[in-house]
Regions:
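ATP-dependent helicase/translocase motor core
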Residues: 1-311, 316, 320, 324-335, ...
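Short basic/glycine-enriched coil/helix segment immediately N-terminal to the Walker B
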Residues: 84, 272-276, 305, 358-361, ...
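Structural recognition of the conserved hydrophobic beta-strand(s) that form the central parallel beta-sheet
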Residues: 131, 365-368, 394, 420-425
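Conserved helicase ATPase motor motifs in RecA-like P-loop NTPase domains
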Residues: 283-284, 399-401, 415-432
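Residues immediately C-terminal
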Residues: 321, 371-374, 399-403, 429-430
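Conserved motor-coupling elements within RecA-like helicase/translocase cores
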Residues: 344-365
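SF2 helicase catalytic motif II
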Residues: 384-420
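Interdomain helical connector at the RecA1-RecA2 junction of SF1/SF2 helicase-like NTPases
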Residues: 434-517
Length: 517
């Protein structure tokens, strides 16, 4: 109550209490906390958190904070709970290194809690959950057995994400507040564990460079945590197909992956330094469309602080990619416009209208340039607007449609010299493609296959030799297709071979047999 009144001095005590009562009610919603999060992170006149000045917020930590449903008596007590302005927005579960079942036991425990409706209110208010047994990650094991992981709430199953700090010295160089011996003793007395102060493990665990302390500093230091609270979560209305063939929508809550967090922070840093273009190389399947969504929210506020309005464009070169991107943005709550022609796009670019939807949602235009990407006609953009306007282009796999020597995209970006150009890719670039991409500048952020495999997002492909019996069978089929004629392998049309029914049947038989083993 005190924090609400301090951040909102225009509210009377009665109005502040009514606001807190409203929050209590919406936390009981069966919406994974969406309504509460929208209220927490919004730019409305009513503030629950001051996102601009970290020191205007009240920060507290407690141990074994009891979360109890008074009606049922069900309860649990996280090891550590973090409060911002009295709201329990994060908790940490910590275990000893080399503990039985590693971190798996914690994952199973939180999955049980997530499926228990009696805990819905507390899980709806909790934004970030961290689990650690203070060991380094086992990169050879896709199952999270050891390490420090984070997740957000879910209907029934938590997805444990790894966190790898981009700045290796972030934790060791962080300006921690010194804790006096008397305060340390007071904390240990409060926990009734003064005796552990003389144990070797105690001093080891206090080291800032342990896995647990690194993730806590990376994610819960004030500025980082406020950034995550403001921009790092997304509610996704995912379309799914049920067993009976019917389709429905399932609500999911997502938290930024660490590479999306660092790319978002680096984009802002580059813009602050006057750099208006760059390349983000994140491997396929790592969430580049989601990164664009997070960036819409982050960069809207970034330019609002400069009294500048923003229009966002996401450019693809195929119709199916346009539909896919549109669906991803809509599922996350953006209002999406589309353009399939040059005229549609140029009309929108020349317009000073910032929003077209009645709900006031953030907007993005998804553009398919497939039909007109080779259009080399010059483009004229009038920049004499009565409002300060910044256009931001996300170019998805731009190397496929970008020709610096004369194409629609090249002419468009050249005509809008003040535009922000963020090129996205996740595929290896050929030499000639790298040359054309130099116009976008240096890399903003990279996230390669090796990290994606280690993080469990990408499966490692294992090359295995084909068994002799099947190799001989396929060789016989090739001989039959040649009709008994002696020919060189280089003279055979490979496509006709691999599309032939006899070849396909033999190959499918081998694959099925291999999987059954």
């Amino acid at each position: 109550l005190r924090s609400v009144q301090r951040l909102n001095p225009a509210l009377s005590e009665l109005q502040a209490r009514q606001l807190l009562n409203e929050i209590t009610l919406i936390l009981d919603n069966n919406d994974l906390g969406r309504e509460f999060y929208n209220k927490l992170s919004s730019n409305s006149n009513i503030k629950l958190i001051d996102f601009q000045d970290a020191d205007r917020n009240e920060w507290h930590v407690t141990t074994e904070f009891t979360c109890e449903n008074q009606d049922s008596g069900d309860s649990f007590r996280p090891d550590i709970t973090c409060f911002v302005n009295g709201l329990p927005l994060a908790f940490i579960e910590v275990k000893k290194p080399n503990n039985h079942d590693g971190i798996l036991a914690e994952r199973e425990r939180i999955n049980v809690r997530m499926s228990n409706e009696k805990f819905r209110r507390f899980l709806n208010v909790t934004q970030l959950m961290i689990f650690s047994n203070n060991q380094e990650y086992d990169n050879e094991n896709r199952v999270p057995i050891q390490g420090a992981f984070y997740c957000c709430t879910s209907r029934d199953k938590a997805f444990f994400n790894v966190f790898r700090e981009a700045d290796k010295d972030f934790a060791t160089k962080y300006p921690y507040k010194a804790v006096s011996d008397s305060v340390e003793k007071q904390i240990l007395q409060h926990r009734n564990c003064v005796v552990i102060k003389n144990l070797p493990d105690y001093n080891t665990n206090k080291d800032t460079n342990t896995p647990t302390n690194r993730i806590l500093t990376s994610m819960l230091s004030k500025e980082r945590f406020l950034f995550l609270l403001r921009y790092g979560f997304a509610y996704v209305d995912r379309k799914i197909e049920l067993e009976d063939g019917s389709k429905t929508t399932q609500l999911e809550k997502h938290v930024m992956r660490y590479q999306q967090l660092f790319a978002s922070l680096t984009i802002r840093k580059k813009l602050d330094n006057g750099i208006k273009s760059g390349i983000i190389w994140h491997t396929q399947g790592s969430g580049k469309t989601a990164l664009a969504y997070y960036s819409v929210r982050s960069l809207t506020d970034f330019y609002a602080a400069k009294n500048t309005a923003v229009k966002f464009y996401f450019i693809v070169d195929r119709l199916d990619l346009m539909e896919q991107a549109k669906d991803e943005f809509v599922a996350r709550g953006l209002s999406v416009r589309t353009a399939n022609s040059r005229d549609e796009l140029m009309s929108d670019i020349r317009s000073t209208n910032l929003t077209e939807n009645a709900e006031g949602k953030a907007e993005i235009m998804v553009v398919n340039i497939q039909k007109f990407k080779q259009d080399s006609a010059k483009i004229q953009i009038d920049s004499n607007y009565s409002i300060r306007l910044q256009r931001i282009f996300f170019i998805d796999e731009a190397h496929r449609g970008y020709n610096p020597h004369g194409s629609f995209l090249a002419n468009l970006l050249a005509a809008d010299k003040d535009a922000i150009k963020i090129a996205l890719t996740g595929t290896p670039l050929l030499k000639e493609e790298r040359e054309s991409w130099r116009v976008f500048g240096d890399y903003i952020d990279t996230y390669y296959y090796d990290k994606s495999i280690a993080d469990g997002y990408t499966l490692k492909l294992m090359r295995e030799p084909v068994e002799t019996i099947y190799k001989e069978k396929i060789e016989n089929i090739l001989d039959k297709l040649a009709g008994g004629i002696e020919v060189r392998r280089s003279d055979i049309d490979r496509n006709k071979i691999i599309e032939h029914e006899s070849y396909l049947n033999a190959l499918i038989d081998y694959i099925i047999a291999d999987f059954r083993r």
